[in-house]
Amino acid sequence: VLRRRPPADELPRTAEGLHELGEYARRAGVKIVLEPMSRFRSHVANTPAQMLAIVNRADHANLHILLDTYHLVTEVRDYAAAIRSVGDRLWGLHACENDRGVPGGGLIPWPAVFAALKETKCQYVGFEGYNTGIDDFGWRRGIFQNVCPDGDAFVRQAVAFTRPFVK
């Protein structure tokens, strides 16, 4: 994470590079999906609004946005408004709790999240969990609690919790 003010030309250069990448990926039949990450992970785009500004400036139809509830908990207060603000650029959502655990029982306002997703063209919801018991996987990512010791159980619980929201 950059611990100083970014250079003035960073946003224009980022947008220009993303436009070129979007075109290259389009020719290859691949979508580019970008995820804003919390200020503790990146300085480039921390909020949905910041990522949307970069994508709009890059001005390529092949650039899309993926939001992550783990990063939203740090950067926004109104999840539904943040999700809706991305509009047609929203491709998907990484769903996990504020501690990266199974959805449900934490701080994420799931009814508001799924209500807002229904107002978008979101094509994908994936469950993101990390098993810190696998070598140094979690430690290298700053995840010190093993909130996902059993990936199969994580997915079963996540599906059971979220299924009522998507019907």
Each model region followed by its residue ranges:
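Histidine-acidic metal/acid-base catalytic patches
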Residues: 45-67, 72-167
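Active-site acidic/histidine proton-transfer and metal-coordination neighborhood
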Residues: 1-64, 74, 145-152
